[in-house]
């Protein structure tokens, strides 16, 4: 968990509540994603870690973001800058995404395989995970040759390792103990 998890929670909740009220969840998520990416820039990170006055810092950050942030987002940035929390924007984004997924009863499921899976295989995984989690799932597929064969499925804290690499690792652990 990020060092900013606790700090980011009230900001994520405030942004989420506002976005729900204004029916602009997608817009706010995109804005938060953009600002989070801006904070990851090395030079911007140094600027945010510096000793600029909060008003100057907010105005500079807003200028860097340009047209990507509307008036409401600018106010949000000003409040975060005033409290010295702009570096928490990546965590604010993550918590915003979780709140949105909870509202929409969806969960992101990461599927890792050695080769690209066919649509039929993905459909089976999707149905099985929806049944197990009692939520709609959004599959994010990745290819990782190190799994050798099979799949690894991750949804939050749940990890289902059906890969050959996982079996070999478990066998190694048993043989070593």
Swiss-Prot record:
SUPFAM superfamilies, alphabetized: N-terminal domain of the delta subunit of the F1F0-ATP synthase
Keyword Transcription regulation annotated: no
InterPro entries: ATP_synth_OSCP/delta_N_sf, ATPase_OSCP/d_CS, ATPase_OSCP/dsu
Function: F(1)F(0) ATP synthase produces ATP from ADP in the presence of a proton or sodium gradient. F-type ATPases consist of two structural domains, F(1) containing the extramembraneous catalytic core and F(0) containing the membrane proton channel, linked together by a central stalk and a peripheral stalk. During catalysis, ATP synthesis in the catalytic domain of F(1) is coupled via a rotary mechanism of the central stalk subunits to proton translocation.
Source organism superkingdom: Bacteria
Gene coding for it: atpH
An example molecular function term from Gene Ontology annotations: proton-transporting ATP synthase activity, rotational mechanism
Alphabetical UniProt keywords: ATP synthesis, Cell inner membrane, Cell membrane, CF(1), Hydrogen ion transport, Ion transport, Membrane, Transport
Protein's name in the database: ATP synthase subunit delta
Oligomeric and partner information: F-type ATPases have 2 components, F(1) - the catalytic core - and F(0) - the membrane proton channel. F(1) has five subunits: alpha(3), beta(3), gamma(1), delta(1), epsilon(1). F(0) has three main subunits: a(1), b(2) and c(10-14). The alpha and beta chains form an alternating ring which encloses part of the gamma chain. F(1) is attached to F(0) by a central stalk formed by the gamma and epsilon chains, while a peripheral stalk is formed by the delta and b chains.
Lineage: Bacteria, Pseudomonadati, Pseudomonadota, Gammaproteobacteria, Enterobacterales
Topological type in the membrane: Peripheral membrane protein
Principal subcellular localization: membrane
HAMAP family membership: ATP_synth_delta_bact
Localization (cell): Cell inner membrane
């Amino acid at each position: 968990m990020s060092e900013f998890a606790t700090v980011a929670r009230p900001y994520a909740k405030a942004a989420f509540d506002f976005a729900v009220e204004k029916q602009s969840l997608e817009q706010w998520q995109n804005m938060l994603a953009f600002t989070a990416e801006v904070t990851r820039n090395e030079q911007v990170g140094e600027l945010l870690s510096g000793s600029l006055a909060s008003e100057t810092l907010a105005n500079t950050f807003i200028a860097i973001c340009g047209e990507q942030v509307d008036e409401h987002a600018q106010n949000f940035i000003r409040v975060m800058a005033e409290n010295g929390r702009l570096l928490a924007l990546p965590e604010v984004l993550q918590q915003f995404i979780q709140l949105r997924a909870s509202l929409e009863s969806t969960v992101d499921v990461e599927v890792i395989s050695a080769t690209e899976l066919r649509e039929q295989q993905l459909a089976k995984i999707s149905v099985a995970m929806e049944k197990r989690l009692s939520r709609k799932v959004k599959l994010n597929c990745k290819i990782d040759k190190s799994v050798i064969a099979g799949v690894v499925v991750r949804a939050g804290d749940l990890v289902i390792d059906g890969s050959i690499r996982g079996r070999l690792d478990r066998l190694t652990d048993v043989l070593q103990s």
